[in-house]
UniProtKB/Swiss-Prot annotation:
Upper lineage: Eukaryota, Fungi, Dikarya, Ascomycota, Saccharomycotina
Gene: EOS1
Keywords recorded for this protein, A-Z: Endoplasmic reticulum, Glycoprotein, Membrane, Transmembrane, Transmembrane helix
Regions crossing the membrane: 137-157, 168-188, 196-216, 322-342
InterPro entries for the chain: N-glycosylation_EOS1
Protein name stated in the entry: N-glycosylation protein EOS1
Length: 366
């Protein structure tokens, strides 16, 4: 036999718990947001500045490559893609050399005289060996790829360092890693392109190195796991029994009549002077003024939020993340570069064939 009793539990406690769970979900929505919430405004600015130091070389060489592409495209001293103009330039070059030999001068003197003439000879010789405007445009594309990879590497490492180390240590590590990337880029540029003429293959190599570094950091940071609890996302005290499903999901019923609970007959002491209504079924007996021995509400469980991050001992390689965030940008840039270099190769082949015809005309076989 059960009794319907009124208790002092109000609906504001359930609303408070629901609001607390919603706040917890919103706060722990992302690993990066959670890690950055521990930083002050000054610390956040220092972390961003140390990260953006690595972006300076790619940004600088993007504008340098675009400026060189503009200058090469605007150079009109000689037009390589007009057969008549190239023929005239080669004819002028060989005529000067033949006149120098006819005057019984040495080859060195003739070459020096030809170079010191109008400057067309040296321009002709360097026209087939210098980079074209399209190569500098492709170089700016690979600078952009290197810029993206540098940012992605340091941004992923930043979350791990903020969680694992102190804020000052994380800032110092970010600054050191940025200097390492900048030093590597400048070292490759100074060794592979000392005269600043061969940017394209250098930045392709830099992007390949940064791709390998991105895979390494993806493996390194794979042991950082974000823990999100189920059913309220809180830990309950083990000394208190769990709440029933009706208590968790019955918020609407609690708003209508939040002072009604069900109790057993043994928990109620019925005084003898209270009037009870006759009931043939012998079921429920309404009590006017019952004295309840255990009328207090059950103790609410203590809530302990779990740690948001945890480090596991096993590291893995996330192939999906690497493919989407790393391989796809590099592959797209490689495809565009392939089309541009095929165009340059075709044009270069036409220039060499034209040079061969000129040499055969000026020096026919015997």
């Amino acid at each position: 036999m059960t009794w319907i009793l009124s208790t002092g539990m109000g609906p504001h406690e359930d609303k408070y718990a629901k609001h607390e769970r919603a706040t917890f979900k919103k706060t722990y929505s992302s690993m990066k947001t959670l890690s950055l919430n521990h930083l002050t405004a000054k610390q956040h600015m220092l972390m961003a500045l140390c990260r953006d130091i690595s972006l300076l070389p790619p940004l600088t060489y993007i504008f340098t490559s675009l400026r060189k592409a503009w200058r090469v495209s605007m150079r009109t001293s000689i037009t390589l893609y007009e057969p008549q103009s190239l023929r005239d330039a080669f004819t002028y070059f060989w005529q000067k050399l033949n006149s120098a030999y006819d005057n019984n001068s040495s080859f060195e003197g003739a070459s020096q005289k030809a170079v010191n003439g109008d400057g067309k000879d040296s321009l002709l010789l360097s026209a087939l060996t210098t980079a074209r405007a399209s190569e500098y445009l492709l170089c700016s594309l690979w600078c952009l790829v290197s810029l993206y990879l540098s940012y992605a590497i340091l941004d992923s490492l930043m979350v791990r360092w903020i969680v694992k180390y102190s804020t000052v240590a994380a800032i110092l590590r970010m600054f050191s890693m940025s200097l390492i990337i900048v030093t590597l880029e400048l070292l490759l540029l100074s060794s592979l392109s000392p005269e600043l003429d061969y940017f394209l293959h250098t930045w392709i190599l830099i992007s390949c190195v940064l791709t390998a570094v991105y895979i390494w950091q993806s493996y390194l940071t794979s042991d950082l796991r974000y823990i999100r609890n189920q059913e309220g996302e809180v830990q309950e005290d083990t000394n208190v029994p769990e709440e029933t499903e009706d208590y968790e999901d019955g918020e609407d019923d609690a708003d209508e009549d939040s002072h009604v609970v069900v109790a057993d007959e043994s928990t109620v002491d019925v005084p003898s002077n209270d009037s009870l209504s006759d009931n043939s079924d012998g079921g429920l007996f309404p009590v006017n003024r019952p004295s309840v021995s255990h009328s207090q509400s059950p103790k609410r469980p203590k809530k302990y939020p779990k740690k948001a991050f945890n480090f596991t001992t096993k590291r893995t390689i996330d192939l999906y993340k690497i493919t989407v965030l790393c391989v796809v940008p590099v592959g797209l840039a490689s495809f565009i570069t392939m089309l541009g270099l095929l165009r340059n190769l075709f044009i270069q082949r036409l220039d060499v064939e034209q040079l061969e015809r000129i040499l055969h005309e000026m020096h026919p076989p015997a």
